[in-house]
């Protein structure tokens, strides 16, 4: 059974593929069908488009558009009604080498319901409705503040986004006594109030458009400034109600946002970044054990653990893009597999014959199939956190935790 992580990975990969495709003319059809749309109504609409497209002046464009519409109508015969989230067709002749084109068909059942029926015939596929479904749902508002500076931002999934950084004009405390000192103190408080108002406006303008999507707001900073800022009327009530916690942190610039997220993720474990950090840190603890822990990394070691059904958890970087090339000897049928296509045709180790390329697969898809067969849990991690970047840069984007330490052959 496919995990939500894997479905999102496949969905994102499909959109990246579609984005790179182009037609010679306006020959690529994007058809979005909401779940409550009658298939018979869609077919009738396509018949009308077919009639209209018969008048296209360019012979090749007319031929290709009509072929695409026919292809969609023939496939719609297999649907009594759209799936629960709707149906999206991407069909048309895409440009290949030189002046050549080839028919391309992609049918997607999106992760979220399609809201609007749409038919577009263009030189590229229209992906806007689907791309909006990739937007991160795990969103938190971030504010770090003291009297000298403040930074407002978001945590979206595992990615920190800076909205604005501001330095204040609040002068340092005046140590001389007398009337001039009291007047100077009043000026300091006026300047501080103006600065807090400005930061409140920045936060209000940033957070309010997304207030329904924001899970919580965290405020951090040194001293009591953060409490004062929250208690007064600098933030809208809707935002105040979302404030989950306040944290003592040492910095109020961009590094302060990272420190705030670190503190928040320690106390609130249902955050996506918390879950990723916990998983990766567990793996790191295992590989550091001097007696040999359950941690495993490296493509060959991961595949061996999967094939022996000894991998409990597979960790994959969500930016990992590799293919596996399988070559077969025409004489003895031995095979060799590579994750980078060899520059020269490989030779068979037994009879020195030139081997033939018989299969080319996506590495992540292959690993997921093996994981499914082995009952292995699969987690995709991003490169937005330090831990996630470490999985990609130090371990090649693949890591795992075994069920038991395999016995070493004597």
Swiss-Prot record:
One of its GO terms (cellular component) is cytoplasm. Disulfide bonds: none annotated. GO terms for molecular function: translation release factor activity, codon specific. The keyword Transferase does not apply. It holds the Pfam family eRF1_3. Keywords: Cytoplasm, Protein biosynthesis. It is found in: Cytoplasm. It comes from the Archaea. The keyword 4Fe-4S does not apply. HAMAP family: Rel_fact_arch_1 (MF_00424). Directs the termination of nascent peptide synthesis (translation) in response to the termination codons UAA, UAG and UGA. Heterodimer of two subunits, one of which binds GTP. Belongs to the eukaryotic release factor 1 family. This is Peptide chain release factor subunit 1. It comes from Picrophilus torridus (strain ATCC 700027 / DSM 9790 / JCM 10055 / NBRC 100828 / KAW 2/3).
């Amino acid at each position: 059974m496919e995990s939500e992580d894997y479905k999102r990975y496949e969905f994102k990969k499909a959109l990246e593929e579609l984005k790179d495709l182009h037609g010679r003319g306006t020959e690529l059809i994007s058809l979005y069908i909401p779940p409550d749309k009658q298939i018979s109504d869609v077919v009738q609409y396509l018949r009308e488009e077919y009639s209209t497209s018969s008048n296209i002046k360019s012979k090749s464009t007319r031929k290709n558009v009509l072929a695409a519409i026919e292809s969609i109508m023939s496939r719609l015969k297999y649907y009594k009604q759209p799936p629960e989230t709707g149906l999206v067709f991407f069909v048309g002749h895409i440009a290949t080498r030189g002046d050549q084109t080839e028919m391309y068909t992609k049918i997607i059942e999106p992760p979220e319901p399609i809201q609007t029926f749409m038919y577009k015939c263009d030189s590229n596929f229209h992906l806007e409705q689907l791309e909006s479904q990739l937007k991160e749902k795990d969103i938190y508002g971030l504010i770090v503040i003291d009297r000298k500076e403040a930074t407002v931002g978001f945590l979206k999934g595992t990615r920190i986004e800076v909205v604005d950084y501001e330095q204040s004009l609040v002068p340092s405390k005046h140590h001389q006594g007398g009337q001039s000192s009291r007047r100077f103190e009043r000026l300091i408080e006026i300047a501080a109030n103006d600065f807090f108002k400005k930061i409140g406006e920045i936060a209000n303008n940033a957070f309010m458009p997304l207030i329904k999507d924001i899970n919580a707001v965290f405020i951090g900073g040194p001293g009591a400034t953060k409490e004062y800022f929250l208690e007064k009327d600098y933030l809208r009530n809707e935002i105040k109600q979302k404030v989950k916690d306040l944290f003592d942190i040492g910095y109020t610039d961009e590094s302060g946002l990272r420190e705030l997220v670190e503190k928040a993720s320690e106390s609130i474990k249902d955050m996506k970044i918390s879950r990723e950090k916990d998983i990766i840190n567990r793996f790191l603890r295992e590989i550091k054990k001097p007696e040999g822990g359950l941690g495993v990394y490296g493509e060959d070691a991961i595949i061996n653990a999967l094939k022996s059904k000894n991998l409990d958890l597979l960790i994959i970087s969500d930016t990992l893009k590799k293919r596996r090339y399988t070559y077969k000897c025409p004489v003895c049928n031995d095979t060799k597999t590579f994750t980078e296509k060899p520059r020269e045709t490989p030779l068979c180790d037994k009879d020195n014959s030139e081997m033939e390329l018989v299969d080319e697969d996506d590495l992540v898809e292959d690993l997921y199939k093996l994981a499914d067969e082995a009952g292995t849990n699969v987690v995709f991690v991003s490169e937005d956190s330090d831990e996630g970047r470490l999985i990609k840069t130090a371990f090649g984007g693949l890591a795992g935790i075994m069920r038991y330490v395999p016995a070493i052959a004597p």
